[in-house]
Regions:
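Short, compact, well-ordered microdomains
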Residues: 60-89
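Secreted/processed peptides and extracellular or luminal domains of membrane proteins
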Residues: 39, 48, 83-85
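Propeptides and adjacent flexible N-terminal/non-core segments of secreted
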Residues: 1-42
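Generic detection of long, well-ordered alpha-helical segments
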Residues: 39-43, 56, 60
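Basic, alpha-helical nucleic-acid-binding regions used in initiation and control of genome expression
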Residues: 44, 48, 65
Length: 89
């Protein structure tokens, strides 16, 4: 199911992609990590990342390629995707 403001995306989602900002906004927002509060939610896995990518129209191979790339950049869980992939040191 596509998010109401999303367009279908083919291939993996990477930093610099036109949909990257929407992805990070959703991952950091109340439907996922919820960084807009005093604490945040992270289960130590990529459950929110995977769900949001699917809702944005990525198929399973594209999600797998995206998450493999995120792990290669230090994004082994949802919050690390934001800290390490979106804002590398």
């Amino acid at each position: 199911m596509l998010h109401k403001n999303a367009t279908a995306t083919r291939g993996p989602l990477m930093p610099g992609d036109p949909s990257w900002g929407e992805f990070i906004e959703r991952l950091a927002g109340p439907e996922a990590c919820n960084f807009h509060t005093d604490g945040w939610t992270c289960f130590g896995d990529l459950r929110f990342t995977t769900r949001i990518l699917g809702e944005m129209g990525l198929d399973e191979p594209s999600i797998d390629a995206s998450t493999a790339s995120f792990k290669g950049r230090g994004g082994y869980c949802d919050c690390e995707v934001i800290f390490n992939v979106d804002h590398p040191t």
